[in-house]
């Protein structure tokens, strides 16, 4: 009996807490709704004080533009009250500022995009730029798809170490099927070249030694030629 009473009390308390949460949410929503209505009505009243706005422009005019136009209109009225503000026309003539000159501020503000629209417009690219970016991305994909061994080494690369008299050529061979780099070294055979006489001064010059490669040794050491 006691257990059933405790369970009932817990259920009642949970329902009360749930109802209190719902009521708090509803109250906060109603408060936010009244706040939004007050702000909208205040902006509608502010728009009525801005001249030279068409009815369709008033309906679609954002709040930030309404604030900017209101500040510009206040500055314009201050200049009119001063009486010393002059405006330069297209014919390079000066005339006093009038109330109707505020139409220029209206047209300029309506023409300007909002900040987020302006950022989106600046991010738009022309067709040539898009093609150039796509071509660069395609080339990058092609280069990244080639194996690393093929990118780094050509099928044959020779590296020479030491003087010519003790020349050792190191060939790097790339297997296109397994992309493994194999190294093979062989010592070139040197042969002495005969001295040739100079027909003008009758002196002999030693043209040095030249490497001679035996084709049979190259075939035995190179797996491609086998």
UniProtKB/Swiss-Prot annotation:
Segments of skewed composition (Polar residues): 1-15
PROSITE patterns listed in its UniProt record: BHLH (PS50888)
Segments of this protein annotated with the region Disordered: 1-35
Matches recorded under InterPro entries: bHLH_dom, E-box_TF_Regulators, HLH_DNA-bd_sf
A family per Pfam: HLH
Statement: the UniProt record of this protein carries the keyword Ribonucleoprotein: no
Record localization: Nucleus
A GO biological-process term: developmental process
Chain segments annotated as transmembrane: none
Annotated stretches, region: Basic motif: 23-36
Residue ranges of domain bHLH in the record: 23-77
Keyword set, alphabetical order: Developmental protein, DNA-binding, Myogenesis, Nucleus, Transcription, Transcription regulation
Region feature Helix-loop-helix motif, mapped onto this chain: 37-77
GO molecular function ontology, one term from the record: DNA-binding transcription factor activity, RNA polymerase II-specific
Disruption phenotype: Adults are viable and fertile, but with a moderate frequency of somatic gonad defects, which increases on an ehn-3 mutant background. Low frequency of embryonic lethality, with embryos arresting paralyzed at the two-fold stage; increases in frequency significantly on an hlh-1 or unc-120 mutant background. Many embryos that survive to hatch become uncoordinated, dumpy larvae with variable body shape defects, typically in the posterior. One quarter of the embryos from homozygous hnd-1;hlh-1 heterozygous parents exhibit reduced expression of myosin myo-3.
Keyword check for Ribonucleoprotein: no
GO CC annotations on file: nucleus
Function statement: Probable transcription factor which regulates early embryonic myogenesis, in cooperation with transcription factors unc-120 and hlh-1. Involved in controlling the number and position of somatic gonadal precursor cells (SGPs) in the gonadal primordium, and embryonic body shape.
Name this protein carries in UniProt: Hand transcription factor 1
Source species of the chain: Caenorhabditis elegans
């Amino acid at each position: 009996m006691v257990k059933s009473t405790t369970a009932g009390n817990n259920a009642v308390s949970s329902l009360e807490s749930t109802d209190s949460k719902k009521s708090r949410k509803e109250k906060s929503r109603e408060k936010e709704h009244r706040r939004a209505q007050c702000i909208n009505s205040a902006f509608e009243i502010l728009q009525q004080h801005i001249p030279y706005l068409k009815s369709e422009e008033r309906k679609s005019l954002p709040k930030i533009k309404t604030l900017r136009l209101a500040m510009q209109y206040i500055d314009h009225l201050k200049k009119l009250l001063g009486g010393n503000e002059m405006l330069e026309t297209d014919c390079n003539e000066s005339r006093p500022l009038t109330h109707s000159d505020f139409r220029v501020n209206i047209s300029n503000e309506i023409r300007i995009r909002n900040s987020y629209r302006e950022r989106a417009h600046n991010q738009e690219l022309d067709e040539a730029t898009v093609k150039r970016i796509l071509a660069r991305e395609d080339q990058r994909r092609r280069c990244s798809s080639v194996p690393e061994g093929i990118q780094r080494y050509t099928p044959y690369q020779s590296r020479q170490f030491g003087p010519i008299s003790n020349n050792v050529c190191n060939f790097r061979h790339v297997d296109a099927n397994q992309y493994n780099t194999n190294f093979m070294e062989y010592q070139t055979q040197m042969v002495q070249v005969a001295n040739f006489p100079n027909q003008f001064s009758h002196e002999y010059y030693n043209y040095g030694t030249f490497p001679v490669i035996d084709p049979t040794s190259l075939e035995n050491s190179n797996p491609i030629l086998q």
